[in-house]
Amino acid sequence: MKLRPAVVELVVRDMAATLAFYRQLGLDIPADADNEPHVDVELGGMRLAFDTEDTIRSFDTKSSPPTGGHRVALAFDCVTPEQVDAAWVELTGAGYEGHLAPWDTFWGMRYAVVHDPDGTPVDLFALLSA
């Protein structure tokens, strides 16, 4: 069996706060989606889905938020090292939690990590040679 990945899904506490964060990263999410229990965003061949905790519990009564660390991270290509720094400043300046300030990695990238409103790590990166 060979399956094709199609959707990455995030379970969120506060849909409006989460969507505001991902809009700040440049995702095209309609403003009227803030009160929806489920939102899909096209990512050029894949989709990013957001479901509220209540939506998941409506069909999986045993569902509970993860504890003790994250189970998924998203990574955004910022194209240039300067854009990594600019994205970090913009997001942390907007009040989002900065987890790891921008640094140059040993694998040749400029890298930073911020948390979305649910604590999901969002990596910001660019090749140093860009």
Put a short name on every predicted segment.
Residues P5, V12-M15:
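Onset of an N-terminal alpha helix
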Residues A16-A17, A86:
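Alpha-helical macromolecular-interaction surfaces
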Residues P121-L124:
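Short glycine-/small-residue motifs
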Residues L10-R13, T80:
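Short, surface-exposed ligand-recognition loops at beta-strand->loop->(often short) alpha-helix junctions
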Residues T18-R23, L91, G119:
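Conserved active-site tyrosine of GNAT-family acetyltransferases
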Residues M1-A6, D28-H115, A126-A130:
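Vicinal oxygen chelate
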